[in-house]
């Protein structure tokens, strides 16, 4: 896959200089073509910029109105496809493949066509958290035919072998070879994926607390999957405010079938889409809900410093983080300032994860199910350096868990009151 190299930067500077000279000193003829170190032909700066955009998938540069919508494409009554991606990682799931996320009611044989040519190797990969529900999630793996470049693939045709019914699925993401990603290529250091915002699950003030507190902790982007039709006016106003201020990205998410036919409201779809959305874009991505906060334990270390230490081993792709249940006795925001009593027990089963997205192939709700290389590791952290505060309406006793309040209390109160007043919540 082409990359942004020093020679391309030098070429860009040289072209800019030439354009300036030509503008001030017109000449009869111009040099027709330039070449980079790979022999790629460039006629102007625009072609270089086009090449750069092929290398890194930048969502905000895609002129597609559906980019912030999880688009389910119907193959037939028993199959929906979405979020197709090219996968340039040479790992334990094969190389090179175009992959398609699918909800299906039963396993069947499928074929794929890429740029008019049939894929010679097609297989289904089942997610580990389907729990024998009617609708189950799979990844359809389609081997890239020889002679086709990933960057020239814009869609894949998925065909049910028995009926010949098909659907064309646009490529949504381009996943780079994770071994050649450099630190300066990430847009964000830390982001959060919120798999689902249910219409009556939280009020607008809880959202304000969640966004402001995580911003204070250094989170640069929060991705929220929600069905806008289920939200009340205050919630819509609050989400729009933060979306307009670029602190959150809203992704519209509406299942194409009944929720009771799929495990846990179909959150595997949003978790996986958000994993792909952050791959190559964010260094560390957290998966948690609005009533959960990742908390660094050591006072002198920030969240980013704590996470960086936990991922010091470059083969670690995921950290399963233990949590403490906090008694949400006072049911008004900011919860983190008013509720500080937890149970003594550390919860190590229903963990939450922070991951290096490019190293993960399958992410679950509470654990990482598969990494992309056999030598990559998913490890568990018992809460000594990092833990999750989970606020629940239960009587927990009797430990003090006021780390968030002590560290960010004054700033959070100021920012919370400011936004609540501004939006008249």
Swiss-Prot record:
Q: How is its activity regulated?
A: Inhibited by EDTA, Cu(2+) and Zn(2+).
Pfam families registered for this protein in UniProt: Glyco_transf_92
Keywords, alphabetical: Glycoprotein, Glycosyltransferase, Golgi apparatus, Manganese, Membrane, Metal-binding, Signal-anchor, Transferase, Transmembrane, Transmembrane helix
**Modification(s) after translation:** N-glycosylated.
Instruction: Supply the enzyme class, top level.
Output: transferase
Question: Where are the glycosylation sites?
Answer: 109, 152
Top-rank taxon: Eukaryota
Q: What remark does the entry make about the cofactor?
A: Can also use Fe(2+) and Co(2+).
Q: How does it sit in the membrane?
A: Single-pass type II membrane protein
For this chain, the annotated S-S bridges are: none
Give the protein's cofactors.
Mn(2+)
List the InterPro entries hit by this protein, alphabetically.
Glyco_transf_92
Please state the Enzyme Commission number of this protein: 2.4.1.-
Which regions face the Lumenal side of the membrane? 30-425
Listed name of the protein? Beta-1,4-galactosyltransferase galt-1
């Amino acid at each position: 896959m082409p990359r942004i190299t020093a020679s391309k930067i030098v070429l860009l500077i040289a072209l800019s200089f030439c354009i300036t000279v030509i503008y001030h000193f017109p000449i009869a003829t111009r040099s027709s073509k330039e070449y980079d170190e790979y022999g790629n032909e460039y006629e102007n700066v625009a072609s270089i910029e086009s090449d750069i955009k092929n290398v890194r998938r930048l969502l905000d540069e895609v002129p597609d109105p559906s980019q912030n919508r999880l688009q389910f494409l119907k193959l037939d009554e028993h199959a929906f496809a979405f979020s197709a991606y090219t996968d340039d990682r040479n790992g334990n799931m094969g190389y090179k493949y175009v992959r398609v996320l699918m909800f299906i009611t039963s396993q069947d044989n499928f074929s794929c066509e890429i740029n008019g040519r049939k894929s010679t190797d097609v297989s289904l990969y089942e997610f580990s958290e389907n729990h024998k529900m009617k609708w189950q999630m799979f990844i359809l793996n389609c081997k890239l035919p020889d002679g086709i470049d990933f960057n020239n693939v814009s869609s894949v045709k998925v065909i049910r072998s028995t009926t010949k019914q098909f659907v064309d699925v646009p490529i949504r993401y381009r996943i780079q070879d994770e071994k050649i990603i450099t630190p300066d290529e990430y847009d964000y250091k830390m982001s959060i994926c919120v798999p689902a915002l249910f219409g009556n699950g939280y009020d607008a003030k809880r959202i304000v607390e969640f966004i402001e507190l995580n911003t204070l902790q250094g989170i640069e982007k929060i991705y929220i999957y929600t069905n806008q039709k289920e939200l009340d006016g205050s919630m819509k106003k609050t989400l729009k405010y933060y979306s307009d201020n670029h602190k959150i990205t809203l992704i519209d998410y509406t299942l194409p079938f009944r929720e009771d036919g799929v495990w846990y409201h179909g959150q595997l779809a949003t978790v996986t889409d958000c994993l792909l959305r952050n791959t190559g874009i964010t260094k560390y991505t957290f998966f948690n809900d609005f009533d959960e906060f990742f908390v660094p334990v050591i006072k002198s270390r920030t969240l980013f410093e704590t996470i960086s230490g936990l991922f010091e081993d470059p083969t670690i792709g995921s950290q399963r983080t233990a949590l403490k249940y906090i008694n949400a006795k006072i049911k008004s925001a900011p919860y983190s300032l008013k509720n500080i009593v937890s149970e003594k027990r550390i919860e190590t089963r229903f963990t939450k994860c922070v991951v290096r997205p490019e190293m993960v192939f399958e992410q679950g709700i509470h654990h990482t199910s598969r990494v992309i290389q056999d030598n990559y590791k998913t490890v568990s952290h018992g809460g000594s350096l990092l833990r999750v505060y989970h606020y629940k309406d239960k009587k927990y006793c009797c430990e003090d868990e006021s780390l968030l309040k002590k560290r960010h209390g004054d700033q959070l109160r100021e920012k919370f009151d400011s936004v609540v007043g501004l939006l008249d919540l």
